[in-house]
């Protein structure tokens, strides 16, 4: 325990030297050390994939279509955070607030139109992320 306390102290000292605001440093600390492996690694459960891929991806594991199942998986599986869209965040984060950090996806795409079109419209804002208590935002870019 003493060794881990010393390591945590050194990590905390390094974090205090980052050129980030207190709020950004706090949110980053929560993601890297407050949840999940707690060793500086980030393990994110991407709950935004239902939008990105559609319901057919859930056929092999029917319980996975239930958002509450996915949230429980994130908490019980010791993930650092979950990534999801604004609709699911508004519906479920009240119940899971403080139990798993939120990375709010600002954009996303569906398989309509086809993958030939790299359309990924914005459907949430940084203001939404702040309102929902997100520790970070996610933005997907399709290059090429």
What annotation goes with each model-predicted range?
Residues 1-47:
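N-terminal basic, low-complexity leaders that serve as flexible interaction/assembly modules and, when applicable
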Residues 2-4, 37, 42-44, 49-144:
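Alpha/beta enzyme core
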């Amino acid at each position: 325990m003493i060794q881990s306390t010393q390591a945590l102290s050194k990590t905390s000292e390094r974090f205090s030297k980052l050129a980030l605001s207190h709020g950004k440093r706090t949110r980053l600390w929560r993601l890297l050390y407050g949840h999940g492996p707690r060793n500086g690694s980030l393990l994110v459960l991407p709950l935004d994939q239902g939008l990105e891929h559609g319901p057919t991806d859930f056929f092999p594991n029917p319980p996975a279509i239930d958002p509450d199942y996915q949230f429980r998986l994130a908490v019980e599986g010791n993930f650092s955070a979950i990534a999801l869209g604004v609709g699911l965040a508004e519906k479920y984060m009240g119940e899971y607030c403080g139990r798993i950090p939120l990375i709010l996806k600002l954009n996303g795409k569906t398989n309509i139109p086809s993958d030939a079109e790299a359309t990924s419209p914005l459907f949430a804002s940084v203001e939404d992320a702040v309102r929902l208590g997100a520790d970070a935002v996610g933005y997907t870019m399709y290059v090429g």
